[in-house]
From Swiss-Prot:
Single annotated GO MF: large ribosomal subunit rRNA binding
Keyword Plastid (UniProt): yes
Role of this protein: Binds to 23S rRNA.
Subunit comment: Part of the 50S ribosomal subunit.
Family: Belongs to the universal ribosomal protein uL14 family.
Protein's name according to its UniProt entry: Large ribosomal subunit protein uL14c
A cellular component term, taken from the record's GO annotations: chloroplast
HAMAP family: Ribosomal_uL14
NCBIfam families given in the database record: rplN_bact (TIGR01067)
Biological process per Gene Ontology, one example term: translation
């Protein structure tokens, strides 16, 4: 579960390395899980890349340490909290996605991110 002030790793090559959640979008909820869109600020970035430190971006959460429970009763947990930076239309800003991605993103219509992922769990 991600809430405001939570730090996340970035799972793409958009130029950002660390994000801090500042708002969870949709329905006035306080926490976000896999597939939810957040507004975040870039806390650490690579030099000479489009995204700079202190840029405000939208991101979709692709991995959480808390995990999600699936319909068949299986609990899916990851080692870290990670997100992919997206634009207003929901397309990823980067061209590559690193690490495993949860299958729940396909149900939330983030098919472009799922197609870029090396592994869908």
């Amino acid at each position: 579960m991600i809430q405001p002030q939570s730090y996340l790793n970035v799972a793409d090559n958009s130029g950002a390395r660390k994000l801090m959640c500042i708002r969870v979008l949709g329905g006035g909820r306080q926490t976000a899980t896999i597939g939810d869109v957040i507004i975040a600020v870039v806390k650490d970035a690579l030099p000479n890349m489009p995204l700079k430190k202190s840029d405000v971006v939208r991101a979709v959460i692709v991995r959480t340490s808390k995990g999600v429970r699936r319909e068949n009763g299986m609990m899916l947990c990851f080692d870290d909290n990670a997100a992919v930076v997206i634009n207003k239309e929901g397309n990823p800003r980067g061209t590559r996605v690193f690490g495993p991605i949860a299958r729940e993103l396909r149900d939330r219509n983030f098919t472009k991110i799922v197609s870029l992922a090396p592994e869908v769990v």
